[in-house]
Regions:
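Bacterial N-terminal signal peptides
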Residues: 1-8
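Boundary at the C-terminal end of the N-terminal hydrophobic targeting segment
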Residues: 8-9, 14
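Beta-strand-rich recognition/accessory modules
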Residues: 15-40, 47-48, 62, 68, ...
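Solvent-exposed N-terminal domain segments of exported/luminal and surface proteins
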Residues: 31-107
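Residues within well-ordered beta-strands of beta-sheet-rich folds
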Residues: 34-36, 43, 120-122, 142, ...
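Acidic (Asp/Glu-rich), glycine- and aromatic
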Residues: 56, 137, 146-189
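Extended, loop-rich substrate-binding clefts of extracytoplasmic carbohydrate-active enzymes
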Residues: 84-147, 161-163
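Active-site/ligand-binding surface loops and adjacent short beta/alpha elements
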Residues: 171-174, 179-242, 250
Length: 292
């Protein structure tokens, strides 16, 4: 999205709903919700649209994600046409974001429920640049722990009257700790044949990457990190930002290209896992085998 929410600018289903929660920021001890099992721990911020803001092995207290602002999370973000809006004094576009806007205003959390191994959020997003609550948009998120894998389901409904042009859409945007520097994927033409993986350290701004096996990962110096698999998505965008003061991050987003048009509903599934790249690839290969 943006420098903060994804696509960088050099100028930069149905669970039962609960009563809407207040728009005011929760107290710190009420803001976070964590789920964990014997493999991993995942955390959500109510003040950021219920988006995923924490991920680690269960025996670690080191967050592998970056949540420096309301754009840096694992979250939904979509793009429409330029609309005269300004992000930090630079031209921007129609951009509903699950977490909130660039000035720190939270999205409106309509529902947030959880069990021991799952969580659901329903959110009215904000326009990243203007901060307007976009009542014509609804974002939903279902998260489920499945052993060493996190299953994520996202759904976006756009009831606006304007038809926007086609854009690259983040599915989803994912911001990671800057220590995870190396981007790893398979980018050749023989997927799931144990072919050699490609490795790179992205720069700034966005680089576009083929991911023929529909997964991509960032790893640290120890070769371990976070991988994401989005079925049928074969392209991603990535960058690393180094701005200091906690803003350093590694970013990646699998990409689909489509337009926001009246009464659009777009839903997709993604999977996360932790480990070295061989383990990450093997776990995603098992998911592929299970698919019809």
């Amino acid at each position: 999205m943006l420098l903060s929410c994804g696509l960088a600018s050099q100028q930069s289903f149905g669970w039962q709903e609960q009563a809407p929660v207040t728009e005011s920021a929760p107290a710190p001890d009420e803001d976070w919700l964590y789920l964990q099992n014997t493999d991993l721990r995942i955390g959500f911020l109510r003040s950021h649209g219920g988006a995923v803001a924490y991920l680690s092995p269960v025996d670690s207290k080191v967050n592998l994600l970056n949540h420096f602002d309301h754009g840096r999370l694992i979250q939904q973000s979509y793009y429409g046409d330029t609309d005269g809006s300004l992000w930090a004094k630079e031209p921007w576009r129609y951009n509903p974001v699950q977490g909130g806007d660039y000035q720190g205003s939270a999205a409106k959390l309509l529902a947030f429920t959880s069990t021991e191994s799952s969580a659901y959020a329903k959110t009215t997003p904000r326009h990243w640049a203007t901060g307007e609550l976009l009542n014509e948009c609804i974002m939903e998120q279902w998260i489920e722990l499945r052993g060493p894998v996190v299953k994520l389901r996202f759904k976006f409904h756009y009831a606006g009257k304007k038809s926007h042009g086609q854009r690259h859409q983040e599915t989803p945007a994912m911001f990671l700790a800057p220590e995870l520097r190396t981007l790893v994927t398979y980018d050749q033409d023989k997927p799931w044949t144990d072919g050699p993986l490609s490795r790179r350290i992205p720069g700034w701004p966005n680089e576009y990457v083929a991911m023929t096996e529909s997964w991509i990962a960032y790893v640290g110096e120890d070769g371990r990190g976070v991988g994401i698999y989005v079925p049928e998505v074969t392209e991603a965008t990535a960058y690393r930002f180094q701005g200091g003061s906690g803003s350093d991050c590694s970013y990646v987003a699998p990409l689909k290209t489509f337009a926001l048009t009246p009464e659009l509903t777009y839903a997709y599934t993604a999977y996360l896992t932790l480990g070295d790249v061989e383990t990450i690839r093997a776990r995603f290969a098992e998911i592929v085998k299970e698919q019809p």
